[in-house]
Every structure is written in C-alpha cells, then in structure tokens.
C-alpha cells in the first residue's frame, strides 16, 4: 500500500532497535525532457538488498516486487521529481526486524518500506578527505560489504572528528594495517595515476557501489584503462609527489561523482590535481543520461511507461 508519510508504530522491544537487523538501499528517480520518469538501475539495488539481507540473517525480498514498488511510488509522486540536472527524487527502500522480542536470534517478522524525498546535489565544490588511522569502518569477513545500518553508526564519531578538522568525509583504510585504501564515508573512490584509473578491489569489506560499477563500465566503454586492485595510501602519496596523481573522485548514489581536492593523512596533506576532466565527464554523463539529454548507451535507465 502507498500512504502519505507517517510515523511508524514501534514496540519498545522491536528487535531492530536492540540487535541491529536493519538494512537500506538508495537510488534516484529523475524525469526526462519528455516528462517520462526514469529509474537508475533499480534491479541492481534489488540484488544488493538481498545480498545484505542474507548477510544479516534476514529473509530475501522479491526483486520483482522491489522494482514494482518503486515504479508505483514514483508514478504516483512524479510531480515531486525536481527537473534540474543533478537533482532527483531520492528513494530510500529499507527493511528491519519489527518483531517484539528480547533475545539474540533472527526475528520472525520484518517490515519493508520505501520513502521518497526530493534531493539536490550534496557537493558542488571539490572535497577534502581525512584518512583515518584510529578507527575502522569494517574488517574482512565482517559486514562491510552489506548495506547494513550499523555500518553507518560506527562511522558517525570518526566522521564528526574529521569534520572538526576541516575535512568533509573519512577515507577508510584497512582494519589490520591501516595501509590499504578501502572507501570513503558514503562513496567508493577512484584514482587516476599516470593515465590509469585505479579503484580498490572488492575484498569483502567494501560496499559494491552501483555507481562504482556503472563508472567502471562507462570508463571502459570510453577506452580508459581501469584496474581494480589493492592500493596503499603510500602509493597515493608517492604519486602526488611525482606529479602522477592526475585525478581522484568519489562515486555514490547520493553524491553522484565528487571531485577530491586533497587527502589528509597523519601530518601529510596529499594534494590532487585541481582539474578533473574525466571525473567531470563521468558526472556530466550520469546526470545527462538521467534526464535523457545524453544517450543511454549502457542501458542504465528504466522508463516508467504511462
């Protein structure tokens, strides 16, 4: 059923509040120049939601029903889709354990809900990252590759500390050595070093971003070399010193593509080039495809037929 936004009645013993069985997704609906609503790769969100559900011991949700629910909601609320390029109707599907029970086990009942809200670009300027060396986001074999609510709770304090130092987000390093780059607070990350694009490989502790996947496909479609591999913070420092760090940008549903100005690491500031021509091309292409201004060569968009 579709209802106006309302409060969710919740028992104090709701298991999600105590044991953290909660996950979410995020995607955007846009509208093309002909007034047709569009969704960006909703099938991939459906797949990832079920991946997260399996990791958290939650039941899977019908992927067909997931996409159909989004289509129905967007069809009803399409007047709320901002027409400006870069803006969208942000969709937040989420699922949580709603059984009233005190005890450590999988819940017997869950709620699946989708809410919608108009949104505009988060970052319009280049951003500054702080490479964290005291806290971790996730460890190998943990829940880092799931879009679990608890992953974000663990990031709140380090993010606030980074912001207090003048940075925008945390750049997470690996849990064992604080050496290998993983991801940014709400984004995956790409570096262009000596003509080659590098993004950390999915090692079981990094979220498989749908924008990340799309950017890799787009770059390869445009004949850029893209490598998914382990990359150390020391390698980035060295590339910056040698003038080989040509670009760096983050990718994610909420931000789209965010150009990185610099990275703070211990007492070092890693400067990135002031220009991001390929990053800007990626951002302009994603935004253009989302409103039908640029041809959808990679079949990202799902049209909502009237």
Regions of interest found by a model, annotated:
Residues 1-64, 68-69, 73, 94, ...:
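Helix-start/capping segments and mature chain N-termini
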Residues 82-96:
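Extended, Lys/Arg-enriched charged tracts that mediate electrostatic binding to polyanionic substrates
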